[in-house]
Regions:
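Conserved N-terminal segment of class I S-adenosyl-L-methionine
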Residues: 1-185, 195-200, 261, 269-274, ...
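A short His-aromatic
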Residues: 186-190
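Short, glycine-/aromatic-enriched active-site segment of Class I SAM-dependent methyltransferases
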Residues: 23-29, 214-239, 243-248
Length: 289
């Protein structure tokens, strides 16, 4: 079914409905969104290929109050620290985060001229598993900062005492600049207007020595997973494929160095990319094999 849209990734106006969700997810249920007459289509932009989540008006209004306190629902009746310990104890071959850290450290190693103590900022640090594994993998030799707006998650991160923590929504604050590596792990899909957000992230990178790692859910989830899969929930604004993610990063003024699809140990389907300011590519070239 063809639909008129306004794609916030490429400004495209024509879309095709690829999936219809007919029941509210657990986040919507927690804020009282009813099941009667519920319909939430995922629409593929015919210009860039991104999938757009068209929320019912009632959901859109109510979810706006929930986004900054995501873990209030996600960990209802459980403990963030408990999940952290469980995931950290997983063997590397069973851990999405272990694979993520391996991708990042391998790319940094292959990209020439890495600084002796790179400054790393993880936006949306969540449970802290990614940064903790990165600290362990690099023997604490880098400088690490986690940004997390959720109060419960931020308190948990501080208790870990493994890296610096800023409890705030990332808004491109001037004090959050000068980083050699910025990571966005399963964050961008939550952003309604991803281009202005990425333009702020670019300002956080060292212009001639900066690298961005982005990982997002794959649009193929709409075809290869159940409609009740968490990835297809109401809090995700977009799903990406390599073309749409690459297009967005280029619109933000970055050079695309690598983009790929991966099936993670958890079964999640993801797209990841490395991108850098043009000055960084001129200075450092392309990553070696």
């Amino acid at each position: 079914m063809l639909r008129k849209i306004r794609c916030s990734i490429c400004d495209g106006e024509d879309g095709n409905e690829i999936l219809l969700i007919d029941r509210p997810d657990r986040f919507e249920q927690s804020i009282g969104v009813g099941a009667q007459g519920y319909a939430r289509p995922w629409v593929e932009c015919l210009a860039c290929g991104a999938a757009i989540n068209l929320l019912p008006p009632e959901s859109a209004q109510r979810l706006a109050t929930l986004r900054a306190a995501y873990y209030e629902v996600d960990f209802m009746g459980s403990d963030i620290g408990e999940k952290y310990r469980r995931v950290m104890s997983m063997p590397a071959g069973q851990s999405d985060n272990a694979g993520r850290v391996a991708r990042v450290t391998d790319f940094v190693r292959r990209w020439t001229g890495a600084p002796a103590r790179p400054r790393v900022m993880d936006i949306g640090a969540g449970t802290g598993v990614f940064l903790s594994r990165l600290v362990d993998q690099t023997a604490g030799a880098w400088q690490y900062l986690g940004i997390e707006p959720d109060p419960r998650a931020a308190a948990h991160l501080r208790q870990l005492e493994k890296f610096a923590v800023v409890e705030a929504m990332y808004l491109g604050q001037p004090e959050l600049r000068g980083f050699n590596l910025v990571t966005l792990n399963k964050v961008l899909e939550h952003i309604e207007q991803p281009l202005p957000f990425l333009l702020q992230v670019v300002q956080s990178l060292v212009p001639d020595d900066g690298l961005l790692y982005v990982e997002v859910p794959d649009k193929l989830t709409t075809r290869l997973r159940s409609p009740q899969d968490n990835i297809l929930g109401a809090l995700h604004c977009h799903l990406y494929d390599p073309t749409s993610l690459g297009h967005l990063l280029r619109r933000a003024g970055l050079e695309l160095l690598c983009v790929n699809r991966v099936a993670e140990p958890s079964g999640k389907l993801s797209v990841y990319a490395f991108a850098a300011p043009a000055e960084s590519v001129v200075k450092k070239g392309l990553p070696h094999e």
